[in-house]
């Protein structure tokens, strides 16, 4: 494992860009994601791995990972429109993309053991198969009715559902 300093967070800077070309995987930590309170602040769009292949991971894992990246990229592309015109001017499909992307972002905040010092939340282990199934469920819209805050700093999808029920009860009281 090597750490590479990226001047001014510019991944296109010639020095780090040349180095990245020789690596099998890169994990990019993002100040913007950290500012959202999501730890570890890994940017799933800028991070790469040569192992992200259906031949290595299997079709389901690969397709889910690419689906997550696609939704997050579409959300990123909508950021300027949202900043200028607001959410109300988006099409219904774009609003759905934004809602799912925000849930995915928050679900990526799962309390990892290495992030306990930053979050104060105990680390949790979530099985790979459960993670894949849960993210696919978000992509498929199975959890569209759950509030995005229920996806923040939880372990598996059962915790998301339980947290959503708790939020619902608290808001009804």
Curated annotation (Swiss-Prot):
<keyword id="KW-0472">Membrane</keyword>
<dbReference type="GO" id="GO:0005524">
    <property type="term" value="F:ATP binding"/>
</dbReference>
<dbReference type="InterPro" id="IPR000194">
    <property type="entry name" value="ATPase_F1/V1/A1_a/bsu_nucl-bd"/>
</dbReference>
<dbReference type="GO" id="GO:0005743">
    <property type="term" value="C:mitochondrial inner membrane"/>
</dbReference>
<dbReference type="InterPro" id="IPR020003">
    <property type="entry name" value="ATPase_a/bsu_AS"/>
</dbReference>
<keyword id="KW-0066">ATP synthesis</keyword>
<comment type="function">
    <text>Mitochondrial membrane ATP synthase (F(1)F(0) ATP synthase or Complex V) produces ATP from ADP in the presence of a proton gradient across the membrane which is generated by electron transport complexes of the respiratory chain. F-type ATPases consist of two structural domains, F(1) - containing the extramembraneous catalytic core and F(0) - containing the membrane proton channel, linked together by a central stalk and a peripheral stalk. During catalysis, ATP synthesis in the catalytic domain of F(1) is coupled via a rotary mechanism of the central stalk subunits to proton translocation.</text>
</comment>
<dbReference type="GO" id="GO:0046933">
    <property type="term" value="F:proton-transporting ATP synthase activity, rotational mechanism"/>
</dbReference>
<keyword id="KW-0813">Transport</keyword>
<dbReference type="GO" id="GO:0045259">
    <property type="term" value="C:proton-transporting ATP synthase complex"/>
</dbReference>
<keyword id="KW-0067">ATP-binding</keyword>
<comment type="similarity">
    <text>Belongs to the ATPase alpha/beta chains family.</text>
</comment>
<dbReference type="Pfam" id="PF22919">
    <property type="entry name" value="ATP-synt_VA_C"/>
</dbReference>
<keyword id="KW-0999">Mitochondrion inner membrane</keyword>
<comment type="subunit">
    <text>F-type ATPases have 2 components, CF(1) - the catalytic core - and CF(0) - the membrane proton channel. CF(1) has five subunits: alpha(3), beta(3), gamma(1), delta(1), epsilon(1). CF(0) has three main subunits: a, b and c.</text>
</comment>
<dbReference type="InterPro" id="IPR055190">
    <property type="entry name" value="ATP-synt_VA_C"/>
</dbReference>
<keyword id="KW-0547">Nucleotide-binding</keyword>
<keyword id="KW-0496">Mitochondrion</keyword>
<keyword id="KW-1278">Translocase</keyword>
<dbReference type="InterPro" id="IPR027417">
    <property type="entry name" value="P-loop_NTPase"/>
</dbReference>
<keyword id="KW-0375">Hydrogen ion transport</keyword>
<dbReference type="InterPro" id="IPR050053">
    <property type="entry name" value="ATPase_alpha/beta_chains"/>
</dbReference>
<dbReference type="Pfam" id="PF00006">
    <property type="entry name" value="ATP-synt_ab"/>
</dbReference>
<dbReference type="GO" id="GO:0042776">
    <property type="term" value="P:proton motive force-driven mitochondrial ATP synthesis"/>
</dbReference>
<protein>
    <recommendedName>
        <fullName>ATP synthase subunit beta, mitochondrial</fullName>
        <ecNumber>7.1.2.2</ecNumber>
    </recommendedName>
</protein>
<keyword id="KW-0139">CF(1)</keyword>
<dbReference type="InterPro" id="IPR024034">
    <property type="entry name" value="ATPase_F1/V1_b/a_C"/>
</dbReference>
<keyword id="KW-0406">Ion transport</keyword>
């Amino acid at each position: 494992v090597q750490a590479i300093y990226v001047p001014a967070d510019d991944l296109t800077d010639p020095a780090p860009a040349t180095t990245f070309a020789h690596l099998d995987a890169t994990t990019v930590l993002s100040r913007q994601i950290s500012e959202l309170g999501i730890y570890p602040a890994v940017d799933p769009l800028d991070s790469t791995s040569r192992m992200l292949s259906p031949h290595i991971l299997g079709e389901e894992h690969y397709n889910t990972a690419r689906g997550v990246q696609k939704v997050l990229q579409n959300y990123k592309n909508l950021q300027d429109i949202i900043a200028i015109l607001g959410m109300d001017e988006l099409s219904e499909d774009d609003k759905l993309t934004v809602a799912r992307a925000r849930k995915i972002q928050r679900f990526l905040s799962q309390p990892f053991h290495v992030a306990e010092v930053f979050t104060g939340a105990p680390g949790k282990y979530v099985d790979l198969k459960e993670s894949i199934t849960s993210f696919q469920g978000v992509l498929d819209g199975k959890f569209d009715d759950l509030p995005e805050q229920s996806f923040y700093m939880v372990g598996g999808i059962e915790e998301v559902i339980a947290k959503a029920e708790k939020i619902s009860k608290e808001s009804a009281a």
